[in-house]
Amino acid sequence: GLGDVYKRQGELRMSQKLLFIFNPHAGKGQIKNHLVDIVDMMVKAGFDVTIYTTQAQADATRKVVEEGAGYDRIVCSGGDGTLDEVMTGLMQAKLHIPIGYIPAGSTNDFANSLGIPKEMLKAAERAVGQNRFPCDIGDFNSDTFVYIAAFGLFTEVSYKTSQQLKNIFGHVAYIMEGVKQLRDIPSFRMQVEYDGKVFQDEFIYGMVTNSVSVAVSYTHL
């Protein structure tokens, strides 16, 4: 009967190990208000959950490289940068593990492009579900990006804008930092190859994006 089906599903799910990586400071630390409910949802979905809070830039990458192979699924929560770090770790370790994303940053443009709910519990429900889909990613040197890679004007804004300002002002914090860079605008001589075509010119800005909208959270080319 139906009860036996649920029992069998539960037995299968209990063998699944999940690594939950999140940035505790992203988006005004809103993850803290939902953490218990999110973990409870993961456990009820049949996962044995390990929680890790990122402590510094690239910490999520290091965690995935060192321990990712021991898990059946990885879920991350934070801004677009946190997701980039997790994907970089998966690529460096050559792991093929399903990942889930619970957006909690100041912009979350990439999540919006994928139609991931803004409400954290709804996003968590999708992250532990069984509906999977492939997603394009970009790579250069040893870095991987799922959102955007860019060079030139304003590309340092994301790194120079403090987490405290982002939590207080959101998008406006990026604008405030960007205005400071208008005094010094360098250009770059570039050769671009695409679809069998080549062109060269001087550029003050360039980007490759995987999103339908762009704020200012960059990976540097």
Report residues per predicted region.
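Hydrophobic packing residues within well-ordered alpha-helices of enzyme cores
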Residues: I38, A60, V86, F110-A111, ...
